[in-house]
Amino acid sequence: MNENLFASFITPTILGLPLVTLIIMFPSMLFPAPTLLITNRLVSIQQWLIQLVSKQMMNIHNHKGQTWTLMLMSLILFIGSTNLLGLLPHSFTPTTQLSMNLGMAIPLWAGTVIMGFRNKTKISLAHFLPQGTPTPLIPMLVIIETISLFIQPMALAVRLTANITAGHLLMHLIGGATLALMNISMTTALITFIILVLLTALEFAVAMIQAYVFTLLVSLYLHDNT
C-alpha cells in the first residue's frame, strides 16, 4: 500500500521522463486487429461488444451522425480498458487526471457543436432562446443557455474524474484499514476484507459504466447537432 493517499494519482516517471504516453497507448495493444481468416475468442468478444454497443447507441442517429460510429466505439473501448487496467495493483489510471479527461471531452464536444452550427445554424441558434420567452428575460436566458452549453465538456470530464477517483480512494482506505485491523481483530479485518472484495467488484462495473456514460453523452450531444 502507498503511504501517501494520493500517490496513486501521480503520473509515474522513469529517469525523469513521464510514462503517461506509454500508459495511454498500452490499452490499444489489448485489442488485436482481426487479420486472420479464423479469429480467436478475444477478437470475437471484441467484435460482439462493438456491434452490441453500436446498435444501442447509434440507432438514434441519421447518416451524418453514424459517421462517428468508429470514433465513439474506439472511445468507449479506450476509456473502459484504461479504467480496468487502473484497478490492477501498483498501476496508474490516466482517467483520474482532469486534464486528460478535458483533453478528450473538449475536442469531441467542440466537434459536435461546430457540426451543428454548420449543418443546422438556425436550429442551433434557436436553442439559446426558447420559444415564447418574455422580452425582459431574453438577455438572461441567452446568457444562461450559453453557460450551460460551455459547461457540457466540463461536466463530462468532472463526472468521469470524480467517479474513478472516488472509487480508488475508497479501495485505498479500506485496504489500509484491513491491514491495520489484522493486528487488532482478525474477525473485523476479515469483514473489512470482504467489503474490499465487494467494492473491487463494484469498481469493475463502475469502470465500464463510466466509459459507456461518457460515450453516450457525447453521442447525445452529436444527436442534438445533426
UniProtKB/Swiss-Prot annotation:
The chain crosses the membrane at residues 6-26, 68-88, 97-117, 138-158, 164-184, 200-222. The keyword Transport applies. It comes from the Eukaryota. GO terms for cellular component: mitochondrial inner membrane; proton-transporting ATP synthase complex. GO terms for biological process: proton motive force-driven ATP synthesis; proton transmembrane transport. Signal peptide: none annotated. It is a multi-pass membrane protein. Its main location: mitochondrion. InterPro entries: ATP_synth_F0_asu (IPR000568), ATP_synth_F0_asu_AS (IPR023011), ATP_synth_F0_asu_bact/mt (IPR045083), F0_ATP_A_sf (IPR035908). One of its GO terms (molecular function) is proton channel activity. The keyword Transport applies. Keywords: ATP synthesis, CF(0), Hydrogen ion transport, Ion transport, Membrane, Mitochondrion, Mitochondrion inner membrane, Transmembrane, Transmembrane helix, Transport. It catalyses: H(+)(in) = H(+)(out). It is found in: Mitochondrion inner membrane. Component of the ATP synthase complex composed at least of ATP5F1A/subunit alpha, ATP5F1B/subunit beta, ATP5MC1/subunit c (homooctomer), MT-ATP6/subunit a, MT-ATP8/subunit 8, ATP5ME/subunit e, ATP5MF/subunit f, ATP5MG/subunit g, ATP5MK/subunit k, ATP5MJ/subunit j, ATP5F1C/subunit gamma, ATP5F1D/subunit delta, ATP5F1E/subunit epsilon, ATP5PF/subunit F6, ATP5PB/subunit b, ATP5PD/subunit d, ATP5PO/subunit OSCP. Subunit a, of the mitochondrial membrane ATP synthase complex (F(1)F(0) ATP synthase or Complex V) that produces ATP from ADP in the presence of a proton gradient across the membrane which is generated by electron transport complexes of the respiratory chain. ATP synthase complex consist of a soluble F(1) head domain - the catalytic core - and a membrane F(1) domain - the membrane proton channel. These two domains are linked by a central stalk rotating inside the F(1) region and a stationary peripheral stalk. Belongs to the ATPase A chain family. This is ATP synthase F(0) complex subunit a. It comes from Hippopotamus amphibius. The lineage of its organism: Eukaryota, Metazoa, Chordata, Craniata, Vertebrata.
